[in-house]
């Protein structure tokens, strides 16, 4: 999301029910609810549509708007941020099920260019492999929470950077690792730890787990 005003516009649409269904929108009434001119409101809607946060259908009577999955994900991220500010309920907990990964983690985590940074920045030497968890909700962290792992050049290729997010799983210190370039959906996470989590925690595919953000 590019600006606070666009977030506010998206929130206003959700309060009108656009997160659940397509709603008819009067430009003048909508602009008044946001405290801005119809022209400015139209630009906000256009920006949201261009960025993929809403869909719009223009009719002779006005327009019909619905928030996309991307827009809902954005609102959920905002919600979690406000919960962390105002609620005194402890660290955020994510829930999901263990799944089989692609098997590429062992190779990449073993590379010294990554491994040395994991040691320095996360404080542990990771087991060469990842635990993959499919969450019930997308994992959309705030940028300031990330531990940045820089990319580097090998003998024959360049390796991209990634971001890590310290967590605990069943009391074990670990970290979610998310490459800067990934084909994984937002609700699928890879976890590294100083031990083989599957073996040490007795986990199998389909087992439900809780992942606590540090």
Swiss-Prot record:
InterPro entries: RibK_CTP-dep, Riboflavin_kinase_archaeal, Riboflavin_kinase_CTP-dep, Riboflavin_kinase_dom_sf, WH-like_DNA-bd_sf, WH_DNA-bd_sf. Residues 1-91 are annotated as: H-T-H motif-like. Mg(2+) binds at residues 130, 132. Residues 92-214 are annotated as: Riboflavin kinase. Pathway: Cofactor biosynthesis; FMN biosynthesis; FMN from riboflavin (CTP route): step 1/1. GO terms for molecular function: magnesium ion binding; nucleotide binding; riboflavin kinase activity. Pfam families: CTP-dep_RFKase, HTH_24. It comes from the Archaea. Disulfide bonds: none annotated. This is Riboflavin kinase. It comes from Methanocella arvoryzae (strain DSM 22066 / NBRC 105507 / MRE50). The gene is ribK.
